[in-house]
Amino acid sequence: MANNNSAKKRIQIAERNRLQNRSYKSAMRTLMKRCLTAAGSYLEKPGEEAKANLQQNINEAFSKIDKAVKKGVLHRNNGANKKSRLNAAVKKLIEPATKR
């Protein structure tokens, strides 16, 4: 347990930041899942509207990841890996739809 006031305050700040980071990561994961769902719906019914929806979801997810890196929630390499894996997963889902 902290003995002086500054240490107690640092504990409070660390807990506040932990909760904010947790919330931000949760929102980021939600956007990534939404992106994969949009890719699945594009696979079922390929069309301009589904493609636009997919592109919008990808842009939102990438933006959220970039902001997480900028805020220090994620390390920049971790952010780059998340973007790369998300893009690869979306392409893997979309490839069969484009070959039709």
From Swiss-Prot:
GO terms for cellular component: small ribosomal subunit. Keywords: Ribonucleoprotein, Ribosomal protein, RNA-binding, rRNA-binding. GO terms for biological process: translation. It comes from the Bacteria. One of its GO terms (molecular function) is small ribosomal subunit rRNA binding. Binds directly to 16S ribosomal RNA. Belongs to the bacterial ribosomal protein bS20 family. NCBIfam families: S20 (TIGR00029). This is Small ribosomal subunit protein bS20. The lineage of its organism: Bacteria, Bacillati, Cyanobacteriota, Cyanophyceae, Synechococcales.
